UniProtKB/Swiss-Prot annotation:
Involved in mRNA degradation. Catalyzes the phosphorolysis of single-stranded polyribonucleotides processively in the 3'- to 5'-direction. Residues 620-688 form the S1 motif domain. Keywords: Cytoplasm, Magnesium, Metal-binding, Nucleotidyltransferase, RNA-binding, Transferase. The gene is pnp. This is Polyribonucleotide nucleotidyltransferase. Gene3D superfamilies: GHMP Kinase, N-terminal domain (3.30.230.70), K Homology domain, type 1 (3.30.1370.10), Nucleic acid-binding proteins (2.40.50.140). It comes from Sulfurihydrogenibium sp. (strain YO3AOP1). InterPro entries: ExoRNase_PH_dom1, ExoRNase_PH_dom2, ExoRNase_PH_dom2_sf, KH_dom, KH_dom_type_1, KH_dom_type_1_sf, NA-bd_OB-fold, PNPase. Its cofactor is Mg(2+). SUPFAM superfamilies: Eukaryotic type KH-domain (KH-domain type I) (SSF54791), Nucleic acid-binding proteins (SSF50249), Polynucleotide phosphorylase/guanosine pentaphosphate synthase (PNPase/GPSI), domain 3 (SSF46915), Ribonuclease PH domain 2-like (SSF55666), Ribosomal protein S5 domain 2-like (SSF54211). It is an enzyme of class 2 (transferase). One of its GO terms (cellular component) is cytosol.
Length: 703
């Protein structure tokens, strides 16, 4: 069996692509390795194209196998379940750089499957999946205008590193995944800690140099093992139909683009199609195909208006941002809320504060179980675009958009020491016409300020677009949905006035030059600063006080050995405090106790109960105690967990008793007064001198 392996070195570790001895029934399959991490990627194509579609039916599935890490899945079911959020995000990162590189008119189903087969504690397998997908397609007979490659770039101590180790990633202030062809960058995804745009650009270009090396590996692999590509037939009928639509509809579509309202504009454009369809007497079975051709003409009109007349769909200039309307503190019961409206895009964003126990427990194969204290959930209901569709489960798109917005805000979220709350941000998109994820970033920052989360700065986001011809390009600020759909780029940039915190770029052309990237980043910074000015006008700083409906946090410091006393046997004591007060309690082995309560009264009651548990016994004070043992000479009374006292027979009654057993028994609860504490801490109590109207200091223990 033939085994072909092409090797190089990346970040000091061996890096290879191999094929020839596995998954041979797939159209193309490779294994990509870095160090001891290995990812298998297989590409399969259907025999026939799908009918009546105008998009590529591409599916990417990425799965991290437990066996790759030498582990068995936890829980009752001992096999991998549905894809995790991380696996979905990695699959999207594999999909996005390869999708623009399939030829127009290719409508066969393509399935890309990536499995992590082996994983060390050094190198993340996700970027190997990008290279593997490209290599599998490149050596296959599937039409593909690649190859491309993907790398991760981090900056540690001012130095860029390609495909860093996990340890290097943890120290970085910038982390981006860059994918590109030999000539240009095609995809970027990542985050940073307020890093300037110039550094982001240099990181992209640094990664592109390494990408070229990985593309050479793929070219060498194809030269040794590549299959002949299938040909996509030219549709002459489609070409003729497009010319007819241009002749009859171009000018009228151009006039329709003067309508700023999205619904009215689309209604007019659709009416033009219906009229010309009748004029051309297009048969019913070819109407769908004709509608796809008409869409191309609509796209051409929009692009020509921008490129040659500097006119956008809604009449704005290329760098102009839509009107913005902001409202904070929208509803009284939310801990924080904001509505951020930009043109016909609107996000209602809320913030809810909770205790550490309410954080998101995340289980990853590599890191195990971790607790996430800041989370952002993005929801995109069908009504936001006026569609009459039933609600759907959370989509991959919603997960991806939420992750992008979360990454934008996270660098400004205060540490747990500064702000001991779990923070959940929810963005419900109420209207959509482009850039909802960036509206979520803006609305999220406003809602966090409204909630009183002590963020040092606002974060804003903007989506940039691109219209490009062979000899000209125009960068668009704050793109509409149609500009995203019909344009060549969707470049989202979020950050503060001081730098970028999150970035995501997808393109539909074969790559972007340094000039275009630089122009887009500079124009994004100008737009972001304009939006930030409006946000600071709406709410210039975080509120000084939390919502009265937010949980209060009280912190106590106790001796570490007292933690077990607070918990009690089988959790008896802490359960009782929680049941009686409704609070949530977070205990740290260092002796830090955090009490989360819905009211000040509940917090004070919980503190009092904890103090009763851990207090020192004081001479002359009155306590309740349970009899644990009885002898003739007296009874042993437990005042608090682990605190025993002696009730001598002479201190039980003013009358002389022969034996304590005549009066008390095990299990009796007595109200006693501390009469003596000796040098060794031994406690003696009395029943004789107890005032009737004095409450026991530890009464809650016996209620």
């Amino acid at each position: 069996m033939e085994e072909i392996k092409i090797e190089t070195v990346v970040n000091g570790a061996p890096y290879s692509i191999e094929t020839g001895y596995f998954a041979k029934q797939a159209n193309g399959a490779v294994i990509v390795r870095q160090g001891d991490t290995a990812v298998l990627v297989a590409a399969v194509m259907s025999e026939e194209p799908q009918a009546d579609i105008d998009f590529l039916p591409l599916t990417v599935e990425y799965r991290e196998k437990y066996y790759a890490y030498g582990k068995i899945p936890g829980g009752f079911v001992k096999r991998e379940g549905k894809p995790s959020e991380r696996e979905i995000l990695v699959a999207r990162n594999i999909d996005r750089p390869i999708r623009p590189l399939f030829p127009k008119g290719f409508y066969n189903d393509v399935i890309i499957t990536a499995y992590t087969l082996s994983a060390d504690d050094q190198y993340d397998p996700d970027v190997l999946g990008i290279v593997g997908a490209s290599a599998a397609l490149h050596i296959s007979d599937i039409p593909f205008e690649g190859p491309i490659a993907g790398v991760r770039v981090c900056r540690v101590d001012g130095q860029f590193i390609v495909n860093p180790t996990y340890q290097q990633k943890a120290k970085s202030d910038l982390e981006i995944v860059v994918a590109g062809s030999k000539d240009a960058i095609v995809m970027v995804e990542g985050g940073a800690k307020e890093v300037p745009e110039e550094v982001i650009l240099e990181a992209m270009l640094f990664g592109h140099q390494e990408i070229k090396k990985l593309i050479e590996l793929q070219e060498e692999l194809r030269a040794k093992y590549g299959k002949e590509k299938i040909e996509i037939p030219i549709d002459e009928e489609e070409i003729l139909l497009k010319e007819k639509f241009k002749e009859l509809a171009y000018v009228r579509i151009k006039e329709a683009f003067n309508i700023s309202d999205k619904k009215e504009r689309n209604k007019q454009i659709n009416a033009i199609f219906e009229e010309i369809k009748t004029t051309l007497e297009i048969p019913e079975e070819k109407v769908k195909k004709a509608s796809f051709v008409y869409k191309d003409v609509v796209s051409n009109v929009m692009r020509d208006l921008v490129l040659y007349e500097n006119i956008r769909i809604d009449g704005r200039k290329p760098e102009e941002i839509r009107p913005i309307w902001i409202k904070v503190g929208v509803f009284p019961r939310n801990h924080g809320s904001a509505i951020f409206t930009r043109g016909q895009t609107q996000a209602f964003v809320t913030v809810t504060l909770g205790s550490p126990s309410e954080g998101q427990i995340e289980e990853s194969i590599e890191a195990g179980e971790t607790l996430k204290r800041f989370m952002l959930h993005y929801n995109f209901p069908p009504f936001s675009t006026g569609e009459a569709k039933p609600p759907r489960p959370v989509s991959r798109r919603e997960i991806g958009h939420g992750n992008l917005a979360e990454r934008a805000l996270e660098p400004l979220i205060p540490s747990e020491e500064e702000f001991p709350y779990v923070i959940r941000v929810v963005s419900d998109i109420l209207e959509s016409n482009g850039s909802t994820s960036m509206a979520t970033v803006c609305g999220g920052s406003l809602a966090l300020f409204d909630a009183g989360v002590p963020m040092k700065k606002h974060v804003a986001g903007i989506a940039m677009g691109l219209i490009k011809s062979e000899d000209k390009f125009v960068v668009l600020s704050d793109i509409l949905g149609d500009e995203d759909h019909l344009g060549d780029m969707d470049f989202k940039v979020a950050g503060t006035r001081d730098g970028v915190t999150s970035i995501q770029m997808d393109i539909k052309v074969k790559g972007l030059t340094r000039e275009i990237l630089q122009k887009a980043l500079e124009q994004a910074r100008e737009g972001r600063n304009y939006i930030l000015d409006l946000m600071y006008q709406a709410i210039p700083e975080p509120r000084k006080e939390l919502s009265p409906y937010a949980p209060t946090v009280t912190t106590l410091r106790v001796l570490p050995e007292k933690i077990s006393v607070i918990i009690g046997p089988a959790g008896k004591n802490i359960k009782k405090i929680i049941e009686e007060t409704g609070v949530k309690i977070d205990l740290d082995p260092t002796g830090l106790v955090k009490i989360y309560a819905t009211s000040k009264i509940a917090a004070e009651k919980a503190i009092d109960m904890i103090n009763q548990l851990i207090m020192d016994i004081e001479l002359g004070e009155v306590y309740l105690g349970k009899v644990t043992r009885v002898e003739d000479y007296g009874a042993f009374v437990e005042l608090m967990p682990g605190k025993l006292s002696l009730l001598h027979v002479s201190q039980i009654s003013s009358e002389r008793l022969k034996s304590a057993k005549d009066v008390v028994k095990v299990g009796d609860v007595l109200k006693v007064k501390v009469s003596e504490i000796d040098d060794q801490g031994r406690i003696k109590v009395s029943l004789k001198d107890v005032p009737e109207n004095v409450e026991a200091k530890n009464k809650f223990l016996f209620e």
